[in-house]
Amino acid sequence: MNAMFHSLFALSFVSLVASINNQNSRYDKMFLAMVCQDQNGCEVNIRFLKQSFPDSNSTEPLYEHTMIYNNGSLDEITIDVTEDVNIIEFTFTAPDENGTTIVETDSWELNFSETYFHTIGSLQLVGNLPCGRYGCPQTPLCNGSCRFMVIVSLAAFCISVLAGLALQTVYVSFLGFRKTRKAVELRDTLRLTEAAELAH
């Protein structure tokens, strides 16, 4: 009788421990990469929310994170995202090509997309939650399809950054060409004016 009682007690204890462990939030690794092409720096404030704004009267974040970088470096981080997070809100602060500071807010619905990309001014940011939502919590690159998704996301991000740099170079070259052309036209005009005055 005592042995049966102890066995029931042990089973109850094991069930209680298992129940507590199941209630603990699982998490997945989220990858974020950010490029800021301005010397004054860019800032991204990240708020992890339980529900999207239309579905909840409370926008109090479960937790927050801030990224601050500058000078065109590519910075990468990984963040543990718990399963109770459904939406991630980004507040971007970055200067544009004229040096004016831009502040913009955007959100990433984790239930609708595994990847995220946003560009504003001199800042580009890409995010990836590999293998679907909480598909492989401990090893984000757990299989071939996962690796393919991450590689495609990184490739798209790098291509967009290179395209932005190329456009910026072309724009600067175009401005330099126009400036040189105007200087030549002004010089020719002055020479013609001087020649006309000497002729008279």
Curated annotation (Swiss-Prot):
Domain of life of the source: Eukaryota
Listed GO CC annotations: membrane
Membrane-protein topology: Single-pass membrane protein
N-terminal signal peptide: 1-19
Keyword terms of this UniProt record: Membrane, Signal, Transmembrane, Transmembrane helix
Transmembrane domains' residue ranges: 148-168
Subcellular localization: Membrane
Protein name: Uncharacterized protein F02A9.1
Naturally occurring in which organism (per UniProt): Caenorhabditis elegans
